[in-house]
Amino acid sequence: MLAFCRSSLKSKKYFIILLALAAIAGLGTHAAWSSNGLPRIDNKTLGRLAQQHPVVVLFRHAERCDRSTNQCLSDKTGITVKGTQDARELGNAFSADIPDFDLYSSNTVRTIQSATWFSAGKKLTVDKRLLQCGNEIYSAIKDLQSKAPDKNIVIFTHNHCLTYIAKDKRDATFKPDYLDGLVMHVEKGKVYLDGEFVNH
């Protein structure tokens, strides 16, 4: 009974934190919640969250060359020229509020190119585990975070990874477009989904 009460209190405490997060997000966006039920977290809100604890932001890669009529950057398995411009624009806006972060990507051309253009000059670490989009993704995130517990992390991955996380953590249907993202954090060995990143 005591264990149940402790668990219930912990759940209530976390729910209250999530409500507070949604309220904070509402200060920076016109709507605090996306239509998929995820809290909306814009750049300024993300910056405030990062002051409370390190954040993990996962982005879908930029526009794929093999699924677009736009000009390819180079390799057909990579991204388009438009994709590089979009990634650079996103990176500039992101870095204005969170300049210090470690950068990772899965081992595909499109994620590597997206991460490179997102943050020109920053060291990029390629990790093939970030291509695995089941429970394994959480182990990879926790491992990366444990290497530098006080650092923010940016990961470039794939739409099916983001879809899986949103469904698994919040029972939300999330169909990310290019460069859409999710905001997470690791606390006491557990990975939490805070909401959907909205670039404003």
UniProtKB/Swiss-Prot annotation:
Task: Identify a single GO molecular function assigned to this protein.
Answer: phosphatase activity
GO biological-process terms attached to the record: lipopolysaccharide metabolic process
Endpoints of the signal sequence: 1-25
Q: Where in the cell does this protein reside?
A: Periplasm
This entry's Enzyme Commission designation comes to 3.1.3.-
User: Which UniProt keywords are listed?
Assistant: Hydrolase, Periplasm, Signal
Q: What class of enzyme is it?
A: hydrolase
Protein's pathway: Bacterial outer membrane biogenesis; lipopolysaccharide metabolism
Listed Pfam families:
His_Phos_1
InterPro entries annotated for this entry? His_Pase_superF_clade-1, His_PPase_superfam, LipoPS_heptP_Pase
User: Which terms in the GO cellular component ontology are assigned?
Assistant: periplasmic space
As for what it does, the entry says: Catalyzes the dephosphorylation of heptose(II) of the outer membrane lipopolysaccharide core.
Q: Which family does it belong to?
A: Belongs to the phosphoglycerate mutase family. Ais subfamily.
Query: What is the designated name of this protein?
Result: Lipopolysaccharide core heptose(II)-phosphate phosphatase
